[in-house]
Curated annotation (Swiss-Prot), chain A:
Keywords: Centromere, Chromosome, Nucleus
Organism (species): Gallus gallus (Chicken)
SUBUNIT field: Component of the CENPA-HI complex, at least composed of CENPH, CENPI, CENPK, CENPL, CENPM, CENPO and CENPP.
Subcellular location as annotated: Nucleus; Chromosome, Centromere
Name of the protein: Centromere protein L
Biased composition regions of type Polar residues, renumbered to the chain: 20-32
Region ranges (Disordered): 1-32
Function: Component of the CENPA-HI complex, a centromeric complex involved in assembly of kinetochore proteins, mitotic progression and chromosome segregation.
Superkingdom of origin organism: Eukaryota
Pfam families: CENP-L
Family (UniProt): Belongs to the CENP-L/IML3 family.
Lineage: Eukaryota, Metazoa, Chordata, Craniata, Vertebrata
UniProtKB/Swiss-Prot annotation, chain B:
InterPro entries xrefs: Centromere_Cenp-M, P-loop_NTPase
Natural source organism: Gallus gallus (Chicken)
Main function: Component of the CENPA-HI complex, a centromeric complex involved in assembly of kinetochore proteins, mitotic progression and chromosome segregation.
Keywords, alphabetical: Centromere, Chromosome, Nucleus
Main localisation: nucleus
PANTHER family attached to this UniProt entry: CENTROMERE PROTEIN M
Annotated protein name in UniProt: Centromere protein M
UniProt GO cellular component terms: chromosome, centromeric region; nucleus
Amino acid sequence: MAGGRPAGSAIEMEGAMRTLPSSGRPSGTGWQSRGPLFGRNYGLSPGSRLLPPRCQENADPQKMAFLLRKQWTLYSVSPLYKFSSADLKDYARMLGVFIAAEKQKGLAVDVDGELGIKVAMSGLPELRGSEQDPAAVLVQLSLRSSVSPKNSEEKLIWSGWFCCVAGDDLLENLPENFTCLPLFLVNGAESYTAIVGSWFQKTFDCCFRRLAISPLNLTWMAAMWTGCKVDKNTAATELLFSVPHLPQPLDISYAIHPEDAKALWDTVQKTPGEITQEEVDVFMECLYSHFHRHFKIHLSATKLVKVSTGIASAHCDGIIKFLQSQYLIGVLMLLTELAISQIQ
Amino acid sequence: MAVLRPFDKLPELNSATILLVGAEGGPQQQLAEAMLREKKDFNINIHLASSLPLPSERDHLRPRIDLIAFVIDIKSKYSLKNVQASLAYVDVRFFLGKVCFLVTGVGRANNCSVEMNAIWKLGEDYCSPVIFCELELEGIRVATAQRLLRMLQICAGRVPGVSALYFSLLMRNSAGD
């Protein structure tokens, strides 16, 4: 052997090797290997996006108020086959019957308090980006109190809505008889989501999937929402990071005064009304290096889990909360884009 | 700082050396162990480093490096920055087929923190193949280890008639769109 090296093979550590405990990931979590993983389309985001536009004044903010300050779980939906927005009343009746049947399954005795579920479906024509987009559809389940049917006191227990804001990419080459409402937002018990989902799946031959938001897209949201003007003083911009490869979970919360964040963003952004990937990177890099200077922690090595700003807050598991009605359309536009890229 | 050069040392008899560079220690170590477990008819030395440049004080002990694999974890933006910074300490002659980028974590698109365009661009800018894998899965780790071994064999000149440059050109053609 040359140089008197021992025969055989060896691993050698070079320099300052960080020896992290190689804690295995919990198996079976978040493993979703679908889609063209190795293709060039994977994990790409467009070079630039438009800033979320402010809503026009003619749209009534009160109408959309019930969508605000609630946690919505995101799903992506493939196009609905033979769906007609004129038949919403019939659909509501059919869904009501279906839910009653599902609830009765396996029950020998009719538990009447449980079964009085009323289904309402309505259109939300305000929620769209352009005339091309189909009107959003709202589904609400409410519990009838069987004690006093005359009072007709109803308690809302579950709501979900389908929407499509500026889904031009998908709308252009959609085959006939299909309606594209790629984004589905749910607030309520998961059991109802499953029942409603399976009815839509059977009736319109569509497919639901949870829509997770990747840390990369969360950085986009952080930058986009920081750049938005908000009238009054709002909550701090907060970024939540989780540190991987640790035996115990460790979360780092990074809160920035919204005005400071806006000031930083204004120095980064070059063309008004438009955001590029590069600008998003520079913005996050600035925040990371500031944090590193104070705490000697590389936030870029951690996972961005949650972004909350005065506009909205988003969690990587696909949970969103809208806080400003005027930017509702803008936020939905980005979410629609993500939903479309998931189903394509 | 010391730039890593491919040809300033003599090769050792019947052996080949690979250098794995990446910020995440755990998966790299596992990959190295998987490579050692593979059956092979030559000796391999695996050197692990979290970043370049390599410390110069042990330079005289280090064998000639035949292949450098930069490991990028798409879940960590830091790993990409780290690799980008390390590339400055590699001699240009390495990029004639003796460098590859190993991108791990590709099964978890939902955890992606890195813009994929940046990784593709890295491969194009440095004329080096980009290999996608998931080092946290045993099956893919073993397959990746085999693949790297085969590349190492070529880069060390142990496959008659196939040079590192020739091989990387082949890889580029097959990876091209």
